[in-house]
């Protein structure tokens, strides 16, 4: 492993432990040249997931791109970044477990919306407004009414 400080390739492992629920290994390393300490993560190499965009273009699934979009939707909502990282991790795991390695951006958006609805209504609305390309106030009102109706249904189901 190359040292990020001096680019030397000799290092020793100080500590190893499971991370991401056992899906990766976190290693604490020390460069043998400059004694700089750094952390690496090792995970199983997976078959890349291809995302089919709305316009028909295909691109490789980017967890960082999705996480960036979620961070934007969740700004100032008080949601912890680690919770969003977990959401992306869970989504990527679901996609990897599918038999086909192609997924539409629509499916990804719906997965994210379903999960966000459980975590934060504000983040759900903000993400939905971009993902569903809201054109005006009517789109917001319609989504809020649907969200409210879902809440009432869930409340009635728990009361019974």
UniProtKB/Swiss-Prot annotation:
Family matches, as PROSITE patterns: ATP_CONE
User: What residues does the ATP-cone domain cover?
Assistant: 49-139
Co-factor requirement: Zn(2+)
Q: Where are the zinc fingers (unnamed)?
A: 3-34
- Return one GO MF term: zinc ion binding
| Assigned protein family | Belongs to the NrdR family.
Job of this protein? Negatively regulates transcription of bacterial ribonucleotide reductase nrd genes and operons by binding to NrdR-boxes.
Question: Which branch of life, at top level?
Answer: Bacteria
Q: Which gene encodes it?
A: nrdR
Organism (species): Synechococcus sp. (strain CC9605)
Q: Which keywords annotate this record?
A: ATP-binding, DNA-binding, Metal-binding, Nucleotide-binding, Repressor, Transcription, Transcription regulation, Zinc, Zinc-finger
State the protein's name: Transcriptional repressor NrdR
Q: How is the cofactor bound?
A: Binds 1 zinc ion.
Q: Which GO terms describe its biological process?
A: negative regulation of DNA-templated transcription
């Amino acid at each position: 492993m190359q040292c990020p400080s001096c680019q030397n390739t000799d290092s020793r492992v100080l500590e190893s432990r499971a991370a991401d629920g056992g899906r990766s290994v976190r290693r604490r390393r020390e460069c043998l040249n400059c004694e700089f300490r750094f952390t690496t993560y090792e995970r199983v190499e997976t078959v890349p997931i291809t995302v089919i965009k709305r316009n028909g273009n295909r691109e490789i699934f980017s967890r960082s791109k999705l996480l960036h979009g979620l961070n934007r939707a969740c700004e100032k909502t008080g949601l912890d970044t680690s919770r969003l990282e977990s959401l992306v991790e869970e989504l990527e795991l679901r996609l990897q477990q599918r038999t086909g390695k192609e997924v539409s951006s629509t499916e990804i958006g719906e997965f994210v919306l379903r999960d966000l609805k459980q975590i934060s209504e504000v983040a759900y609305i903000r993400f939905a407004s971009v993902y569903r390309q809201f054109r005006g106030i009517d789109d917001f009102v319609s989504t809020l009414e649907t969200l409210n109706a879902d809440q009432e249904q869930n409340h009635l189901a728990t009361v019974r």
